[in-house]
């Protein structure tokens, strides 16, 4: 099942590391398996991964599933290597993943303050332009890293033609950016 406890997360991450993984995207959970924003849980997972998976890139989730906006960036002071940053809102099947502009600006500022590389999550084309605007305003550093999130219900379908278009637009607005999908 889903690794829930700190020790389970560290153990499963170590297995992935041994198999060749170089990056761990971390969501922490409460004992009842609901999403958590508890900075101490993030710190414990981070410490365990650093100890057992030397050199692995640690990326914290700032995602909003069931988490209060005020708490979503509350763990960034632990200075992970990377953290997710959705640059706009999207309709998920079970609700709205809310990322209003002032909230995105605040998370971006915190990542800049702690020298955290954002993984810019792009669920639609507007979010790509929002990310470019964050760089123009000095809230993100170039070169950016973009994650095109595709194949999720109510977001972009996972189609080659769409990805090729997104890459073309990325090169136009952030020519030095790296990307994954």
Regions of interest found by a model, annotated:
Residues 2-14:
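Short catalytic helix/loop segments, enriched in acidic residues and glycine
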Residues 6, 36-99:
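Active-site beta->alpha loop and helix N-cap motifs at the rims of alpha/beta catalytic domains
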Residues 9, 16, 27, 83, ...:
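Conserved, mostly hydrophobic/aromatic
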Residues 17-18, 76, 112:
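Non-catalytic positions within long, well-ordered alpha-helices that form the structural scaffold/packing
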Residues 21-31, 58-62, 121:
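Short beta-strand segments at enzyme active-site cores
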Residues 22-45, 92, 149-154:
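Glycine-rich, proline-tolerant flexible connector loops at the mouths of alpha/beta enzymes
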Residues 34-60, 106-113, 164-176:
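Alpha-helix-loop-beta-strand connector modules within alpha/beta enzyme cores
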Residues 82-181:
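Catalytic alpha/beta core domains of metabolic enzymes, predominantly
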């Amino acid at each position: 099942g889903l690794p829930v406890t700190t020790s389970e997360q560290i153990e499963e991450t170590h297995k992935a590391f041994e198999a060749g993984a170089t990056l761990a995207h971390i969501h922490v959970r409460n004992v009842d398996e609901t999403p958590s924003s508890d900075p101490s849980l993030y710190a414990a997972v981070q410490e365990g991964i650093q100890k057992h998976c030397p050199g692995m890139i640690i990326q914290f989730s700032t995602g909003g599933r069931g988490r209060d906006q005020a708490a979503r960036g509350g763990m960034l002071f632990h200075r992970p290597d990377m953290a997710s940053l959705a640059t706009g809102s999207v309709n998920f099947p079970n609700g709205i993943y809310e990322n209003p502009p002032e909230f995105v600006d605040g998370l971006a500022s915190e990542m800049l303050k702690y020298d955290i590389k954002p993984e810019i999550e792009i669920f639609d084309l507007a979010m790509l332009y929002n990310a470019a605007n964050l760089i123009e305003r000095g809230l993100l550093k170039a070169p950016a890293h973009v994650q095109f999130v595709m194949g999720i219900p109510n977001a972009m379908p996972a189609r080659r033609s769409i990805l090729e278009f997104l890459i073309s637009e990325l090169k136009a607005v952030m020519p030095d950016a790296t990307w994954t999908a």
